[in-house]
Amino acid sequence: MLLKRLCFAALFSLSMVGCTNAPNALAVNTTQKIIQYERNKSDLEIKSLTLASGDKMVYAENGNVAGEPLLLIHGFGGNKDNFTRIARQLEGYHLIIPDLLGFGESSKPMSADYRSEAQRTRLHELLQAKGLASNIHVGGNSMGGAISVAYAAKYPKDVKSLWLVDSAGFWSAGIPKSLEGATLENNPLLIKSNEDFYKMYDFVMYKPPYLPKSVKAVFAQERIKNKELDAKILEQIVTDNVEERAKIIAQYKIPTLVVWGDKDQIIKPETVNLIKKIIPQAQVIMMEDVGHVPMVEALDETADNYKAFRSILEAQR
């Protein structure tokens, strides 16, 4: 049980900051071994694609190539391993789980555009290269949700369903009290010290899994190293409103599942009301005592909700 808890904790911490060459080599090596163990359990293989820009996009893919493709998009500060554990419960689908440009093992150019439309274009290039750009199901958490909306709005005839998990981009709903007054200088999502990381870890989740402080310190150093790029990306995404684009999803009646943690301190849970207004066909599920990352905090329930949603779609065909 202790090993399982440590595996889970190390997995989430890596998913929040990516692989690292931080000073604590023993902690890093141990965590990377755990991550690889979890990827293997989920039948995930790590691959990469060189984009037309010359940048590298790294992604995880499971072995179920006969299943319907499901693109899963992580949020700010995360990477593909946000979905590694839940991936084994979604094994019935052909999973494509990328590191967005600027995160994880993908390239991190300072000069790039990191808004939803630019990331959407890169993801479409990836899917085209794999021959999966049509009949695709798309899901995303936080920033990944905004990118999912942008993708579906651009390619509405190709997207068969949409899964929004505590989605960013619906900014007219306002911000939670916990972030009122936050700036690029004092934002809890931007890490400038070990202590910032410790606070962020508890802030993002309502019931964060246990993680040894020594391991937290290792990952804090990686976030500190990337703080300038993180600040640039955050500055771009907080002004990237996808509400107008979401209206296209309503027009095309793309089946949409909206999932939210009722204890989310990053994006107001009341945002679901705005999304439901813009996308009337959306099914909304509010998860009790869950924070900003349901697929990590409550992966069983999150997976069950999604599979039930997909089962309904199958029955309607």
From Swiss-Prot:
One of its GO terms (molecular function) is triacylglycerol lipase activity. The active site is at H74, S142 (nucleophile), E270 (charge relay system), H292 (charge relay system). Keywords: Cell outer membrane, Hydrolase, Lipid degradation, Lipid metabolism, Lipoprotein, Membrane, Palmitate, Signal. Active at temperatures close to 0 degree Celsius. It catalyses: a triacylglycerol + H2O = a diacylglycerol + a fatty acid + H(+). Residues 1-18 form the signal peptide. InterPro entries: AB_hydrolase_1, AB_hydrolase_fold, AB_hydrolase_sf, Epox_hydrolase-like. Coiled coil: none annotated. Its EC number is 3.1.1.3. It comes from the Bacteria. A lipid is attached at C19 (N-palmitoyl cysteine). It is a lipid-anchor. Pfam families: Abhydrolase_1. It is found in: Cell outer membrane. A lipid is attached at C19 (S-diacylglycerol cysteine). This is Lipase 1. It comes from Psychrobacter immobilis. The gene is lip1.
